[in-house]
Swiss-Prot record:
GO biological process, one term: proteolysis
Source organism (scientific name): Streptococcus pneumoniae serotype 4 (strain ATCC BAA-334 / TIGR4)
Active site positions, chain numbering: 19
EC number per UniProt: 3.4.24.-
Listed GO MF terms: metal ion binding; metalloendopeptidase activity
Family: Belongs to the peptidase M50B family.
InterPro entries hit by this protein: PDZ_sf, Pept_M50_Zn, Peptidase_M50
Name of the molecule in the record: Putative zinc metalloprotease SP_0263
Keyword match Aminoacyl-tRNA synthetase: no
Cofactor: Zn(2+)
Membrane topology: Multi-pass membrane protein
Amino acid sequence: MLGILTFILVFGIIVVVHEFGHFYFAKKSGILVREFAIGMGPKIFAHIGKDGTAYTIRILPLGGYVRMAGWGDDTTEIKTGTPVSLTLADDGKVKRINLSGKKLDQTALPMQVTQFDFEDKLFIKGLVLEEEKTFAVDHDATVVEADGTEVRIAPLDVQYQNATIWGKLITNFAGPMNNFILGVVVFWVLIFMQGGVRDVDTNQFHIMPQGALAKVGVPEMAQITKIGSHEVSNWESLIQAVETETKDKTAPTLDVTISEKGSDKQVTVTPKDSQGRYLLGVQPGVKSDFLSMFVGGFTTAADSALRILSALKNLIFQPDLNKLGGPVAIFKASSDAAKNGIENILYFLAMISINIGIFNLIPIPALDGGKIVLNILEAIRRKPLKQEIETYVTLAGVVIMVVLMIAVTWNDIMRLFFR
């Protein structure tokens, strides 16, 4: 149960933060956001704000989404013959079109729609008590959809495709950008929880209680200058020295040279065997000044991003489904993190957030990266691609993503449960 809750919480935070990036910059760019949803499926709460956005909470706590006017399949489901109820404003214009049996207005006019245009000419035409009538529709009118969600209509001037090219570009980039920001913030939290940022550039190390070095009397902080015949100048050189000195050995002992007050002291220690790796019981020292901790959030996030990009490069040149993890693998990893405490959960949250940010920047049309490429092409050509071409390109990207997701999920299931 804890694993399920951790998965829902981590995935939910990451997706909502990602979608909020799109939401915020869409509004700044003059694009109408018709709905900002937390969760998926049937809605359990809805409120339409003064900004025209419907804020909803939906029953399945799995992420969320934004509906931008003119973006993707955001359309109003009204067809010829659709029965609706019209609520009129004092000036005679339609201010609400009700497609559901919910939010009924006793003063509303029943109409069977024969024609409408909510984007350009802003009118609705149909039969009212067997008589054909035409009404002007207010620019900020709302539509109550079949499930009771009330959203604003989307005239052309507030649609995605009519925003400036830079407005569209930053709107598409803002989702991944927010994932990177979330990663930095979570790493800050971790660094402050741990009392500082790891200092891997020095040979001054923290000696862990009950570790191999502590058992031979090495103090809590020690400067290790040599292991065997290998010089130690930083954390990486210490790891390499231990690996070299213990390679192909059973129950090895190590001669460790420690500098104390200008003089060297040598101790002989038996490292702890941990699944074939030999541990001295040391950790990097920490920098606890505010500036180091502040910068540490950025550097830790950057190091994580570089590792992910390196793995992605290897995956491109050496394709292997076993190197990919889908929802099942993420659930397994979140369950493992939950068993090991809050710090592991936070680290997992930061890493997955950065991972998703990078993944979304891959130039596949269904992803934010693909949309950014289309924005760049539009900027170069000084005109957008034809709508039909953009639709087909996006559809191809969706097909690729669906096939990849099915393959990865199937591979996850086979790897985790049948091997």
